[in-house]
Each structure stands twice: as structure tokens, then as C-alpha cells.
């Protein structure tokens, strides 16, 4: 079973997370940031990952620490659940339409943390959510999952649609990348022999 449990406590956040890579897309998410909860529920559904996540953060300041630290914890969970990465497809990409927005994400579970982020979100907020925190979430994730993620906005004018399309596309790309490839069932998918 490719399952991880993460408990992460700092002076700013207290996070408990359980992730099943081979799930059915069932999630229970409570971070204190409603928009982030919505995005993670979409990610779980489209990636078919089971996700249980609670975060108690200093949202009386703002949502920055919560969003960043949830990204960190989710990245740690993927790293833990993937183990030695034997048999994974390694790569995944998805171009996804969300009304007028069109988002491409591409993943390489390479063991190297790299984020290529090219969203042009037109507003500073969606409801109470600071849209600049979208990038902070993904930075926290890639640095702790040790993978490469490229995000490209090919079209879009509605901030909510752009971010929602990104999380849906990201979920589907991660689903492809972590899937087991029968051709590599007992191998690391790299000529180096390690990821």
C-alpha cells in the first residue's frame, strides 16, 4: 500500500495528513482556508488520491503560513508514499479546459525540485484568498516532493477558473506520474538507477 501519514507542527501551523496514492478520490479537508479546501478536494478527486487533511494555522494573521505549510506537508506525503519509486510511470502531463481557461501541467518525479510557474492571475484575491499564495503552495510542494512541475496558462481571464483548472490538471498529471507501469514493475525508471 502506497500510503503516507504526516504530522507537522510549527509555531505557525499544526497539520495532520493521510494520503493514499491508490485511492478513489475521497477527501476530508479542513485547513481554515475555504478556497484551499476546495482546491485540494478537486486535486484529490481528479488524481484519485484519498486525502485526509486538517490544519490549524495562524489564519488570524493571514492564510500564507497555512497555504505554504499544507503544500510542504503534501509534498512530504507524496515523497513518503512513493518510497523508492520502483515501477512508477514517473512522467505525467495534462492540458485541461475550465470554461475560458486552459491550463497545462507537466510532472517529472525526478528527485530534483523545480517549479516552472507561468500563471497570469488577473486579480489579487478570489474571495478572501490571496491569489499569490497559489505559487507559494506549489513551491512548498515541489521542494518537499522532490519533483519537477511545470504550470502553463494557455488561456484564461477568470481568476477562480485559472486556479481551479490548475489544481484539476495538477491532480490528473500526478495521477499519471505515480501510476505503476508494468514495464518498469521492479525497476527505477531512470538510467541512473535512482530517483
What positions do the PLM features span?
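Structural preference for solvent-exposed beta-strand-turn elements
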Residues: 1-195
Amino acid at each position: 500500500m502506497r500510503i503516507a501519514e504526516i504530522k507537522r507542527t510549527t509555531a505557525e501551523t499544526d497539520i495532520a495528513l493521510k494520503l493514499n496514492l491508490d485511492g478513489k478520490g475521497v477527501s476530508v479537508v479542513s485547513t481554515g482556508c475555504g478556497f484551499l479546501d476546495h482546491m485540494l478536494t478537486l486535486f484529490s478527486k481528479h488524481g484519485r488520491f484519498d486525502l485526509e487533511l486538517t490544519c490549524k494555522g495562524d489564519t488570524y494573521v493571514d492564510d500564507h503560513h497555512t497555504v505554504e505549510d499544507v503544500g510542504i506537508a503534501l509534498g512530504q506525503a507524496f515523497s513518503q508514499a512513493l518510497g523508492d519509486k520502483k515501477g512508477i510511470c514517473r512522467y505525467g502531463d495534462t492540458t485541461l479546459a475550465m470554461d475560458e481557461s486552459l491550463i497545462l501541467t507537466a510532472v517529472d518525479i525526478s528527485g530534483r525540485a523545480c517549479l516552472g510557474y507561468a500563471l497570469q492571475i488577473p486579480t489579487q484575491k478570489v474571495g478572501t484568498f490571496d491569489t499569490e499564495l497559489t505559487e507559494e503552495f506549489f513551491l512548498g510542494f515541489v521542494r518537499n516532493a522532490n519533483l519537477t512541475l511545470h504550470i502553463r496558462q494557455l488561456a484564461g481571464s477568470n481568476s477562480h477558473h485559472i486556479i481551479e483548472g490548475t489544481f484539476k490538471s495538477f491532480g490528473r498529471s500526478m495521477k499519471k506520474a505515480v501510476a505503476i507501469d508494468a514495464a518498469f514493475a521492479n525497476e527505477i525508471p531512470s538510467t541512473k538507477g535512482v530517483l
